[in-house]
Amino acid sequence: MTATPSRPLTGRRVLVTRAAGQATTLSQELRQLGAAVVEIPAIAIQPVALPEDLRAAARSLRGHRPPRWMAVTSSNAVEALRALSLPEDLAGIRVAAVGEPTARALRDIGVNVELVAPGTGAGALADGLIGAGAGEGAVWLPQGEAARIELGERLGQAGADVAVTVCYRTVPVAGLRRLLIPALAERVDAVTLLSPSVVEAVIAAVGPDALCGLSLVCVGSTTAAALRRHRLTPVVASRGDAEGVAAAVAGALRR
């Protein structure tokens, strides 16, 4: 079949490496553009914080002087927040998120999101929160074990009382090399790698040479930097949602 303007990925094969249960929307977008999609989760998400830990953190935040903010940088953290009694546990707490996908995940569990920072970087969220006066109050950061410290540091420097709860960790999927090698051997045109932990898991499994010559589509400067550390060239999507990533894949393979 020949690619058309509406289906530019016809005849192309794209490897999607998102965690199990998180690839559906992206895979649908890619298929709508004509791609043959191979889903191989590179990482698994493991909860760390107990529900009572999250409730205690929310209760502690409510005891601070306003403004009180909860800042969420990943949809993985949203899954952990399902343990809260919503919206009661977040009464009086303003909520900020990095990127529309994370904001959408929060809204899906009944959380009103007041501030959405563009892109995927913590820097933009820090700017938004500081601009909204968060430095005069308290900020709770429910986040992953490997989350960068930039957001908390900047908020603290601005005067905020910052509390961090590690609520999940990412781990490589067992037997990942055994899954990836045959998929890559069958010809892959592009790979989506949407977090540094995914990059490291894939590289540890097959090595950087296995990805040379492929379009490596990522989201955000942190993930792009992870690829560059392995001397790989990233294609950085301008938007972090599924439609934006799929468009970046199509753009990369059109060149």
Enumerate the language-model features and the residues they cover.
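Signature of uroporphyrinogen-III synthase
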Residues: M1-R255
